């Protein structure tokens, strides 16, 4: 009987953690959606972008959502690839300081444009606007998540 109590306790804790994870993920996706909706309205108002795909709610969600997911996957992949190069080539001057960040930014912007953006004909955003948006994301990443030591590494 003690085993059953212990098992139900672990199941309850797992469900609580899973509930917190799902709720926080839903809140994050809601804020992301509102932020991207606001960004799209700003781009339309300033005549910097045009979003001409307007079917139903779910069609729009799949079309624009896949644009965001593929863009995120591209940015994430290039970021990890650049970190891999930086780790394996520590003495290379291109992977140190501002050179590393400029190369990461340029490669990420160009790859996003040619891998994702040109295939979405209903999303018309100028290249320089994409450069500014991705540059802003890089600045936010460096401000809020600077390179730091692994605090769990005990030596």
Curated annotation (Swiss-Prot):
Membrane topology category: Multi-pass membrane protein
- Tree of life domain: Bacteria
Q: What is the name attached to this protein's record?
A: Multidrug resistance efflux pump SepA
State the Pfam families in the record: SepA (PF17080)
UniProt main location, coarse: membrane
Query: What would be the name of the gene that encodes this protein?
Result: sepA
Known role: Involved in multidrug efflux.
The family line of this record is: Belongs to the multidrug resistance efflux pump SepA family.
């Amino acid at each position: 009987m003690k085993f059953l109590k212990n098992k139900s306790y672990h199941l309850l804790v797992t469900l609580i953690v899973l509930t917190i994870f799902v709720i926080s993920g839903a809140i994050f996706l809601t804020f992301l959606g509102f932020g991207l909706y606001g960004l799209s309205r700003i781009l339309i108002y300033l005549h910097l972008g045009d979003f001409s795909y307007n079917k139903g709610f779910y069609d729009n969600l799949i079309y624009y959502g896949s644009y965001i997911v593929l863009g995120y996957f591209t940015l994430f992949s290039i970021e990890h690839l650049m970190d891999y190069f930086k780790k394996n080539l520590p003495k290379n001057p291109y992977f140190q300081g501002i050179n590393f960040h400029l190369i990461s930014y340029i490669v990420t912007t160009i790859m996003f444009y040619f891998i994702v953006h040109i295939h979405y004909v209903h999303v018309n955003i100028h290249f320089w606007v994409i450069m500014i948006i991705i540059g802003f994301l890089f600045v936010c990443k460096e401000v809020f998540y600077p390179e730091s030591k692994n605090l769990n590494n005990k030596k």
